[in-house]
Structure formats: C-alpha cells, structure tokens
C-alpha cells in the first residue's frame, strides 16, 4: 500500500524561486539606496555612540521598534551597553532609566 498523493495546491517551485529572487533584488536595491543617502547625521550618530560614557538607549514604535530591539540586542551582545525602551513607556515614566552619559537612538520611519 502506498501513501496517497499530496493534494493539488497549484504550487510551482520554479515560480516560487522566481518570486524569491525578485524579492531579494528589490531588497538589495533598497539597501543600496539607503547606503547612498547616509550623510553627516549618520556619522554624528555613530560618533556619539562610540564616545558614549553610558549606555545606548534605543527607542522606536511599530516596525521601527522591531528594528530598534534588534539593534539594541546586537549592540549589547557585542559589548556596547544598550537596551530598548518603547517610546510610549518612556513618556509614562521609563525616561527615569536614562542617566547622564547615555545616548538615545530614536528610530523613525
């Protein structure tokens, strides 16, 4: 006795690969565009984080918050004291966690 055939789904492996490749191309172009738009503000932010005598406090909301959480986690795991604070929580008391010497990295779309 053999297993029944899988149900027909209309799945096309070749089409799935085409769509994946197209998605990667779109994302790669977006990253290249972002790299081209970096200016003095980016360099100033990097300099502030490098010179920070305290911690890097990352804030963001929505998708920017998800990215901010990842940035804070990456900084912390690579030796830079950092943590994430949701801006709504910051406005309701969590700003008290900031101390002199901290640098705030506010993520905005």
Predicted regions and their residues:
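Conserved N-terminal alpha-helical segment that immediately precedes and caps sugar-phosphate-binding
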Residues: 1-109
């Amino acid at each position: 006795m053999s297993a029944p055939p899988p149900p027909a789904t209309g799945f096309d492996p070749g089409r799935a690969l085409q769509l994946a490749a197209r998605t990667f191309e779109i994302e790669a172009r977006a990253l290249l565009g972002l790299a081209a738009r970096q200016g003095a503000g980016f360099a100033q932010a990097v300099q502030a984080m490098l010179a920070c005598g305290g911690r890097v406090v990352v804030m963001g909301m929505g998708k920017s918050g998800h990215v901010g959480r990842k940035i804070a986690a990456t900084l912390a795991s690579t030796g830079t004291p950092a943590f994430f604070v949701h801006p709504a929580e910051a406005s309701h008391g969590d700003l008290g966690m900031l101390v002199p010497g901290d640098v705030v990295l506010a993520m905005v779309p």
